[in-house]
Amino acid sequence: MSDDKPFLCTAPGCGQRFTNEDHLAVHKHKHEMTLKFGPARNDSVIVADQTPTPTRFLKNCEEVGLFNELASPFENEFKKASEDDIKKMPLDLSPLATPIIRSKIEEPSVVETTHQDSPLPHPESTTSDEKEVPLAQTAQPTSAIVRPASLQVPNVLLTSSDSSVIIQQAVPSPTSSTVITQAPSSNRPIVPVPGPFPLLLHLPNGQTMPVAIPASITSSNVHVPAAVPLVRPVTMVPSVPGIPGPSSPQPVQSEAKMRLKAALTQQHPPVTNGDTVKGHGSGLVRTQSEESRPQSLQQPATSTTETPASPAHTTPQTQNTSGRRRRAANEDPDEKRRKFLERNRAAASRCRQKRKVWVQSLEKKAEDLSSLNGQLQSEVTLLRNEVAQLKQLLLAHKDCPVTAMQKKSGYHTADKDDSSEDLSVPSSPHTEAIQHSSVSTSNGVSSTSKAEAVATSVLTQMADQSTEPALSQIVMAPPSQAQPSGS
């Protein structure tokens, strides 16, 4: 046994033998490649599975807090820059025209809660030509920031009373309302503002975007009293049930996102004469807004929104087009596929109709050509029958004695010498028949009866010629009659 396999494995615990050294080298290499796991584990020892799965990844992200909405790092910078700009602007305002609510209010204030789903109001503004007053001249800088409930353009009403500012802003936040106070009435000329108004839009994702509102008015000679209500946004908790307060900002943002989506999908009501038509909301908010409107306005002609502004007409159109684009982007894939199939079916039906008309025209043309071909074939058949009959007549009169007598009497020489006559007798009935055949063939309308009549007339004249040998010339009338009859 040891003689057959002299090569022994020197590995501990292995006593295998091999016949040659190559097998032993391969076996030793297997020992070297074997993994050493150490002692066997007990079943009680449990190793924690740390395989990175998507579920564990999401769990780790939630623990770290990556899914929480982070505040924009530029938000504070924007706020600080806007406050600095407001502070740097020259504010030479009379004490009666400041939009700050003082301790003593001349007339009782009226609270008006604007609904979130209201459509875009008309941005219109009027002020004096002495000073250019921007939008953000209120006491609180938050009046120029639109909260993330909706992206609505505020309705700005500015009347001039020695550079006085009256601002009405539709605050779309569900946790804010508007306090309206009365300003002293005075009549001043209205002139257009030379530039747009700056505005900061606070988006739902935490970003702040600057927006410029164009302000212009068509007539600069209109005198509008300054008895327009003075409006300043004040943070208040409304009594409408179901709307969370300002203490829970996260549910407010999620609800604002849902309402924004609902507002984009539904059709906005029209805007007429700058009066905002309230959207479908709770009856309490709509009733409050309707009751506060006649109290805030003393005279019906005091509003500056009676004069239409040029950018006010383009704003609803652009909003409608953008709404259509959003609806087209948010369409259901099944609806897109259904419309695609409808267009394909319509195109296929049009193609089939065009092809049917083309095939019908080809069939009609083929029928016309086949009828014309049949007519030509019938004419050819008639002409061939006529030629065959004429050949039979010629063969029948080939050995006729009249023809032999004409040849003997020298009819050919007499025919050649006579040049004063119009028509002469042909040299033979064969030539006469050929001449008649050519005439009838050229016309294409001769018949067998006419050919027989011509042949009999020629034979009759030839018989008369044989009875009168004294005449040297015979003028034949039948050939002249045969030609008009053939024609």
Curated annotation (Swiss-Prot):
Q: Which GO terms describe its cellular component?
A: CCAAT-binding factor complex; cytoplasm; H4 histone acetyltransferase complex; membrane; mitochondrial outer membrane; nucleoplasm; nucleus; site of double-strand break
- Do the record's keywords include Secreted? no
The record's PROSITE patterns line, in alphabetical order, gives:
BZIP (PS50217), BZIP_BASIC (PS00036), ZINC_FINGER_C2H2_1 (PS00028), ZINC_FINGER_C2H2_2 (PS50157)
* PTM note: Phosphorylation of Thr-51 by MAPK14 and MAPK11, and at Thr-53 by MAPK1/ERK2, MAPK3/ERK1, MAPK11, MAPK12 and MAPK14 in response to external stimulus like insulin causes increased transcriptional activity. Phosphorylated by PLK3 following hyperosmotic stress. Also phosphorylated and activated by JNK and CaMK4. ATM-mediated phosphorylation at Ser-472 and Ser-480 stimulates its function in DNA damage response. Phosphorylation at Ser-44, Thr-55 and Ser-103 activates its transcriptional activity. Phosphorylation at Thr-51 or Thr-53 enhances acetylation of histones H2B and H4.
Polar residues bias (residue ranges): 264-275, 425-436
- Residues with the modification N6-acetyllysine, per the entry, are 339, 356
According to its UniProt record, where is this protein located?
A: Nucleus; Cytoplasm; Mitochondrion outer membrane
- Subunit details for this protein? Binds DNA as a dimer and can form a homodimer in the absence of DNA. Can form a heterodimer with JUN. Heterodimerization is essential for its transcriptional activity. Interacts with SMAD3 and SMAD4. Interacts with the HK1/VDAC1 complex. Interacts with NBN, MRE11, XPO1, KAT5 and CUL3. Binds through its N-terminal region to UTF1 which acts as a coactivator of ATF2 transcriptional activity.
According to its UniProt entry, what is the function of this protein?
Answer: Transcriptional activator which regulates the transcription of various genes, including those involved in anti-apoptosis, cell growth, and DNA damage response. Dependent on its binding partner, binds to CRE (cAMP response element) consensus sequences (5'-TGACGTCA-3') or to AP-1 (activator protein 1) consensus sequences (5'-TGACTCA-3'). In the nucleus, contributes to global transcription and the DNA damage response, in addition to specific transcriptional activities that are related to cell development, proliferation and death.
User: Which PANTHER family does the record match to this protein?
Assistant: CYCLIC-AMP RESPONSE ELEMENT BINDING PROTEIN
**Which protein, by its recorded name, is this?**
Cyclic AMP-dependent transcription factor ATF-2
The organism of origin for this protein: Mus musculus (Mouse)
